[in-house]
């Protein structure tokens, strides 16, 4: 009797379920509207006077003795300027100095300003004012800068000229030429051969 009662109850339950209207289908969630990224802003037009210097763009490094190295980074020309930085790292990790360089296209010339600071970021008392150089010539992946005509504004000391050039696609060469002291032969130029950091 208990089994029959249980079967009767189950059948009644089944019949009532079968007779009940089917539940309404669950609405399918609509996909969110596609979101498009905003268009990248147009880059400022680069001053044509800086285009011959674009070869300097990138990160460059040279290994030196005793585990030391030098690094130089140049942002691409944008608008009327480009920016560069330089540091020398000793084998023990210390950085004795940094240099920060700005190249700017002015109305009738291209200038290079450079600040030199100690490793603790304090300015060198002998170089509080930036050095001022002027682009002498540029082309063919080579550029030469010379001190401004007014020595008081140039703050270039015994510097004669600075030249950057590419030696192949992945080697940036920096040549620093000192002035010859009166009555003495010119000192040998300093040359830094820096490989592109990839």
Question: Residues of each region from the PLM?
Answer:
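N-terminal helix-cap/turn-to-beta initiation motif at the start of protein domains
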Residues: 45-59
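Extended Gly/Ser/Thr-rich low-complexity repeat segments
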Residues: 157-170
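Edge beta-strand at a domain terminus
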Residues: 126-138, 171-198
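Compositionally biased, proline/threonine/alanine/serine-rich low-complexity intrinsically disordered stretches
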Residues: 17-46
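Central antiparallel beta-sheet cores of small beta-barrel/beta-sandwich binding domains
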Residues: 47, 62-151, 155, 160
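Short, structured patches in soluble enzyme cores that scaffold and shape functional sites
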Residues: 147-149, 166, 176-178
């Amino acid at each position: 009797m208990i089994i029959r009662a249980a079967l009767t109850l189950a059948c009644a339950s089944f019949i009532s379920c079968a007779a009940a209207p089917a539940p309404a289908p669950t609405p399918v969630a609509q996909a969110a509207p596609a979101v498009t990224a905003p268009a990248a802003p147009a880059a400022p037009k680069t001053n044509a006077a800086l285009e011959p210097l674009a070869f300097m763009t990138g990160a460059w490094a040279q290994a030196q003795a005793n585990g030391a190295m030098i690094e130089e980074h140049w942002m691409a020309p944008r608008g009327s300027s480009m920016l560069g930085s330089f540091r020398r790292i000793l084998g023990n990790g210390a950085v004795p100095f940094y240099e920060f360089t700005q190249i700017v296209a002015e109305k009738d010339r291209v200038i290079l300003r450079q600040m030199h600071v100690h490793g603790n970021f304090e300015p060198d008392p002998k170089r509080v004012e930036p050095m001022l150089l002027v682009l002498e010539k540029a082309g063919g992946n080579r550029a030469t800068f010379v001190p401004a005509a007014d020595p008081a504004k140039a703050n270039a000391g015994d510097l004669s000229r600075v030249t950057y050039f590419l030696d192949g696609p992945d080697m940036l060469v920096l040549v620093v030429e000192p002035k010859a002291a009166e009555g003495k032969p010119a000192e040998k130029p300093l040359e830094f051969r820096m490989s592109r950091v990839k």
